[in-house]
């Protein structure tokens, strides 16, 4: 295409070049129309990357050393520099060696994580999990958790296993990796390269047989535990006259943090989990935080410096809060599955080791007495439950002294000498004083065992009894939760809390207020409800998020009373709950109501308010 054809073609003059920087230090260039929507650009980027699940990612531009995420409903030119919107004929011609031709200089856009999750199994797409892992890799390089130095060595071992595979002595020796690519600069400066290259290979060797997918999951789980990795930073001002922001707002997965900017570090001043934030108000440049349950005089007032930044922060905070609330039942379910898997692994190794120790002397004794090996094979091993209600037996692993033929009632017997034991007991005890074990018994013991198992089925999740396939080393798609756009833009998702946006006209001012109510207890009704106490516990306000899940049934009962009101929210779907108390997974993508524009474009003089309180649901509800 010659210059004459290009300058005479109006359609080509409206095209520009954008350069998309990816989390893995690579980039892609795209020629697009200058009036394209941000959503259309994101779709093109995902198509190039073959990424199917992009709901945790976003497009951002750097403004004043901050990542400003684009609203997907806006046009791209609202975020681009003024020079980028000029006609191509007026743009200075750059050298072709830089990849810039008659389309003008490229606009720099970053494809990065916008919403953090604490468990990699929530990311269903394999490629999305890969870029999420690389984003955390870059965040770890800037981490400053001095008291968690050992975590960086463990993360480096997971990353080496994911990048290089199993440790091989012939290949992985000497400087087979760059410490600067896996450790923060202060760790390399403190320990030195020689120290890292000496000790990391042993930690890399310990991750043998760990697949890349499993290494990604372990890296994600460990990296988000660092305080300054899964976080977004935004500058704040104490008053309007400040030239440089002396405060920093940190948006984490679980809430909001306020830091004091010192010379080379940030000092934490306030840490507000989402359960302790009552209301967020943006009035022009003013940013107000009202802690839940405190009078209005205790509110924190800061300034953003620009009304546009106020609106951007409001949307980012509200979407992060909504996603956090919607994912809590799913995370509780994943935690329970992981805990059950850990218990099964521990229980199986415990039984297997003791069986090997106890069967050897029995076998020697049988050989010494001249008994046949077949009689040993048919010895019954009965496993006693750890959740017996009245027994006081001690722990131990014993075999029956009398040989007996296998029958249909012998669920734990087999033809092999080392029989597989069915792990189907609960770890919770209802009055028993004994520990787990394997002991001898006859027909009466069989009846007691079956009775114990029936009682345990009322406590345990039946899905925990199903054996996991040993041959699958990759992460199963059933273990992943599909995060959809409805989790970010929905009124109700499986009954979980969503945003309700209202326009309230003010009689004393020409401005209007956008109120977003979610959950909790309104500070306006605090005097009337200050004496309201939960019936089951008197100290639930001090419980953590992990402890609150113990009261899930009470919450389902309370939240069900106000399900039909416009400002009430419940956890779980309308289908019948199984014995685990969770909702059906099919409702994650089906039972939701979309909001076309959760935060419509408004003038800078608008009064924005994000209210996280509620009048009918108690404060302890998560």
From Swiss-Prot:
GO terms for cellular component: apical junction complex; cytoplasm; cytoskeleton; plasma membrane. It comes from the Eukaryota. The keyword Transmembrane helix does not apply. The modification Phosphoserine is found at residues 522, 525, 542, 544. Residues 384-395, 425-438 have a biased composition (Low complexity). PANTHER family: FERM DOMAIN (PROTEIN4.1-EZRIN-RADIXIN-MOESIN) FAMILY, FERM DOMAIN-CONTAINING PROTEIN 6. This is FERM domain-containing protein 6. It comes from Mus musculus (Mouse).
